[in-house]
Amino acid sequence: MPLLDSFTVDHTRMEAPAVRVAKTMNTPHGDTITVFDLRFCIPNKEVMPEKGIHTLEHLFAGFMRNHLNGNGVEIIDISPMGCRTGFYMSLIGTPDEQRVADAWKAAMADVLKVKEQNQIPELNVYQCGTYQMHSLSEAQDIARHILEHDVRINSNEELALPKDKLQELHI
């Protein structure tokens, strides 16, 4: 099985909250697609609660688009990581990490402005696969955590696992 890019970085050295360019690729038509690792939690030390991350998924996608789309950037998708320590964001364009960090913080401020659970987009049986698994208060706790900390930049070069370590791990 091929080694995925996300598993070539040392999760024991990742900072959070932090932005990292996880991957950049070009389409056959010349568009650049950038995948960002938006790390909310320190891997293996913190985890977002399932209801909170699910609610955040519904809110974050729209709020990030409000703050980041434009000037050569269009978000394709924002999805939670299975480990519940962050989100992956795929987009067309190449915004720098600071622009992404600023949009992220603005989106978290928007999450705190949501007053009622019924204001969560697509929160119904028709548009959500587990519409009863939500918590606005947990999502707002996550947002508060981000806003109370500096959003840093994680560098692939600094986090790269050495080849000998990858071999030791049988990868």
Curated annotation (Swiss-Prot):
Bound cofactor: record note: Binds 1 Fe cation per subunit.
**Reported cofactor(s):** Fe cation
Q: Molecular function terms in GO for this entry? A: iron ion binding; S-ribosylhomocysteine lyase activity
The record lists the catalysed reaction(s) as: S-(5-deoxy-D-ribos-5-yl)-L-homocysteine = (S)-4,5-dihydroxypentane-2,3-dione + L-homocysteine
Where Fe cation is bound, by residue? H54, H58, C128
What biological-process terms (Gene Ontology) are attached? quorum sensing
- Tell me if NADP is a UniProt keyword of this record: no
Q: Which UniProt keywords apply?
A: Autoinducer synthesis, Iron, Lyase, Metal-binding, Quorum sensing
Looking at the UniProt entry, the stretches that span the membrane are none
Q: So what EC number does this one have? A: 4.4.1.21
Q: What class of enzyme is it?
A: lyase
Self-association or partners: how does it assemble? Homodimer.
Which function does this protein serve?
Answer: Involved in the synthesis of autoinducer 2 (AI-2) which is secreted by bacteria and is used to communicate both the cell density and the metabolic potential of the environment. The regulation of gene expression in response to changes in cell density is called quorum sensing. Catalyzes the transformation of S-ribosylhomocysteine (RHC) to homocysteine (HC) and 4,5-dihydroxy-2,3-pentadione (DPD).
Q: What is this protein called?
A: S-ribosylhomocysteine lyase
Gene that encodes it? luxS
